Amino acid sequence: MKRIALFLLTNVAVVVVLGIVASLLGVNRYLTANGLNLGALLGFAFIMGFGGAIISLLMSKPIAKMSMGVTIINAPRNGDEAWIVETVRAFSEKAGIQMPEVGIYEGEPNAFATGAFKNSALVAVSTGLLQGMTREEVEAVIGHEVAHVANGDMVTMALIQGVMNTFVVFLSRVIGYAVDSFLRRNDENSSGPGIGYMITTIVLDIVLGFLAAIIVAWFSRQREFRADAGAAQLMGRKQPMINALHRLGGMRPGAMPQSLQAMGITGNIGKLFSSHPPIEERVAALQNSQSA
């Protein structure tokens, strides 16, 4: 479960930076030239919101490789690497997607999938996962990650993040305009947004961005149930995924950046912000599902 640090932090950072650049370019003066132009602001918020989410999505794979120290398996160096590649290949063919890049990285038990497009994704597993699980359990985890790719979860989460970003940008500027107008209510010579507007919007972009992450995390948890069921379907039976979840429940999962946590296999953060449901809920959902 690896994602309450990178996609979110990258996304918030991109939105804040774009907001500052827009201020420096005078966009805010245009929006407030004759009072707050709500129509123009909504269009601006839409561009900013989805722009931040799309940039984060496009950056997801290179950031994952760099931040996790992933080694791409182009030519397997041992039996484990050859088995991982062939397992990903078999599941990809069964799921109807092109073969993702396959990687391995040093770390405690975990795995993740990422990438902007389902036919050019990355699936990576940790050395700790290979050492701490049976092959059948690792196979189930790989199936879970391939299911994420086949379900288009990265794009889905980016679209949800884009909607939330739009609300964040819109609300922060409406509130910023109100605060700035109040602070300068006795200044008849003022024109355009002041320092109160800029400070308020930057602070609210960050604060509201983290509140929006709670909603994004809820959607992410629902995608995890689907990926668990997808792994069971790819393997033709659900017990290996259930066994893998039980095993992970007794392990200490490896830490991952936030942008990867929603596409990982387990997590270790507060429930509201957690991108993954509790292990016991996932096991119960899988046991009660119609998969395999």
From Swiss-Prot:
Give the enzyme's main class according to its UniProt record, as a single word: hydrolase
Query: What is this enzyme's EC?
Result: 3.4.24.-
**Where does the record place it?**
Cell inner membrane
Q: Does the keyword rRNA-binding apply?
A: no
Q: Which residues cross the membrane?
A: 4-24, 38-58, 152-172, 199-219
Give an example GO cellular component term for this record.
Answer: plasma membrane
Q: Report the cofactor remark.
A: Binds 1 zinc ion per subunit.
UniProt topology in membrane:
Multi-pass membrane protein
Q: Its Gene Ontology molecular function terms? A: metalloendopeptidase activity; zinc ion binding
In this chain, Zn(2+) is annotated as bound at 144, 148, 224
- What are the required cofactors? Zn(2+)
Does the entry feature the keyword Membrane, yes or no?
yes
Q: Which GO terms describe its biological process?
A: proteolysis
Lineage, top-rank taxon, reads: Bacteria
| Matches recorded under NCBIfam families | PRK05457.1
For this chain, the family text in UniProt reads:
Belongs to the peptidase M48B family.
Q: What is this protein called?
A: Protease HtpX homolog
The encoding gene: htpX
